[in-house]
Amino acid sequence: MSEVPSPEEIFEKSREEGERRLTRPFGELASTALAAGFDIAAGVILIAVLAAPLEHHFGKDAASVAGAFGFGVGFIFLVVGRGELFTENFLVPLAGLHGKPRNAWWKIVELWTVSPVANVLAGLAVACIVTTHGVLPVGSGRVLTDVAQKIHANGTLALFMSAVFAGALITAMTWFVEGHDSVGIRLTVAWVTGAFLALAHLNHVIVVTIELIFGIRYGAAIPWDFVVGNFFLAAAGNMLGGIGLITLNRFTQAKAGSGGGTRKASA
């Protein structure tokens, strides 16, 4: 038997972590976001190095599944290394605002501007390094070019709706991870979420931007104005899904709860 924390307990843990994030210095925020960008770039690389050799033997579909689960390792790095993606700074910092003065909102603005920029800069740096000819195995460029072109082929409405769900998914992951002390549970949730994101090609602002950068570096005919435009489109959709669908609902759940403490669940 294992203890499942109540929504009130998860909210309290999130509030405490949110307060910490809202009071840390700028340097810590920036370095934490840079680390997260590296983690995601590592996951994108794993898509390529796993899928490329499998395509010939098992076909593109099976290779894509393997690559997606490889990408999930990037989310394991994210949780183990305590990096933070832009979308992980919805639920937790907003919980940390509870009972704080209005000027605390400036820290939220700082989080929501510094985090995505640092995430992407780290991913860009990694992409520039590893897309140098001969660094990654043969076929890696083809895989990542295909990934980028699939994203580019989507229409605006599809990209936005995909972004809404991506934001909700990552924010739900944040809630689950914050709610458990078990390292095994935290890593499993992170891995499955990352794989889900990659399998469905969801429009996560940081993940997709880094994937597009890799694709362009390998020769994908995708204009940079699409990358920039989708960045803002995805950010808006991620915020709508993460805050509107998950954060507000979970806060309401915690507030309306009876405070019954932990519940027992089968292991």
Model-identified regions with their sequence ranges:
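Alpha-helical transmembrane segments and their helix-helix packing motifs
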Residues: M1-A267
